[in-house]
Amino acid sequence: MTEHKFRPMTFGVTRVAIRDGAPGVHYLRAEQPLKDFPERMTDRLQHWAQVAPDRSFMARREKLATGGTGDWKHISYAQAWASARSIAQALIDRGLTQERPVVILSGNDLEHALLAMGCLVAGVPFVPTSPAYSLVSQDYDKLRHVLKTVTPGLVFAADAAQYGKAITAAVGSDIEVVLTTGHVEGR
């Protein structure tokens, strides 16, 4: 039998203090105080952009016209930080706020990640929405509900060919639409 080797891992202290509240309610508090942590989620991105600017932050395989995959497209920490800052400024320039957030229709891709980082830098909420609401649904009711609930100032989708029908059906003409590729007729 082959013995698998695993890297040793250290785990934090798991002791907790328990305080009872109302019947059936228990409050747990870790006994170990938190160590220093970044003030903002983007602080680590900024840190690594300075410490290891050329190191790969994210990557994806390029899709070929034949349906296969090509080379890897890498985004370094420095590129990601610069993109996040530029995107943040563009969001601020558009007047996006907590009342007018960004809705992301696309799945997990590099552009989605960079837009999310830009939103974090700018302090603008973003709402990653299940691609199925745009790609599987025929009535777009769930997508309409999301858009009505969060009142976006901007909707992002990676590919107009994939998301165009949903955008046309559900996104109001007063909401800016940003696409990575293609365009939606009338937008």
Q: Predicted segment positions?
A:
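Structured binding elements
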Residues: 123
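Anion (oxyanion) recognition and catalysis
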Residues: 120, 171
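Short beta-strand elements of ligand-binding domains
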Residues: 106, 158, 175-187
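AMP-dependent adenylate-forming
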Residues: 15-29, 44-76
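Conserved AMP-binding/adenylate-forming core of the ANL superfamily
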Residues: 33, 57-117, 134-144, 187
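Flexible, low-complexity linker/hinge segments
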Residues: 30-39, 183-187
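Conserved ATP-dependent adenylate/AMP-binding module captured primarily in the ANL superfamily
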Residues: 128, 132-168
